[in-house]
Regions:
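Acidic/glycine-enriched connector segments
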Residues: 1-171
Length: 171
């Protein structure tokens, strides 16, 4: 999903979204979640992984970060500063696995599906007011709904959360 601020992490709205994402991760942790699975995508996946690694390093050594990358060369075309953050995040993670051996058209979706299949609850930064597209993120949310997963949807600009039990539809 695209955000109004694009990839500008200096934008105030991005900072606020990242703070709320951190809050939701801590709420999940307080509710017993000890393993966080990410697809390591540029954006929310990387932000979430960095938040979890920060918590692991500072206060919660029992927390686990498990990275399911779409394929091994995922970050090849990323900007150098993002590649550096990506590889640091992978270095500090508990476990790493590439879902696909090489880049294929739906590799990102396959990584999301792997995570959804293993998860008890799925935390998404998502705007349900925007019509769904064929993006990997939209298809992953539809997949999570179809798998009857519990969802925590964080609205990227309103910074509200919507918790959806496994039996309900997010839309």
């Amino acid at each position: 999903m695209r955000f109004p601020w694009g990839f500008d992490e200096e934008d105030e709205s991005c900072g606020k979204m990242k703070m709320e994402l951190a809050q939701q991760i801590m709420v999940l942790r307080q509710n017993g979640v000890s393993q966080f699975l990410v697809a390591c995508d540029c954006g929310v996946g990387l932000y979430a992984a960095e938040i979890v690694n920060g918590l692991r390093a500072r206060t919660d050594h029992d927390l686990m970060l498990i990275c399911y990358t779409p394929h091994e060369e995922q970050a090849t075309k990323w900007a150098p500063y993002l590649r550096e953050r990506y590889f640091t995040m992978l270095e500090n993670s508990t476990h790493i696995s590439a879902v696909c051996p090489v880049d294929i058209p739906d590799a990102q979706l396959q990584a999301y599906k792997k995570i959804i299949d293993l998860a008890d609850v799925v935390l998404c930064v998502y705007d349900t007011d925007i019509p769904a597209t064929s993006s990997a993120e939209d298809r992953a949310l539809a997949y999570a709904e179809g798998q009857h997963k519990s969802l925590v949807l964080l609205h990227p600009t309103e910074l509200t959360t919507k918790q959806i039990s496994a039996a309900h539809d997010a839309r």
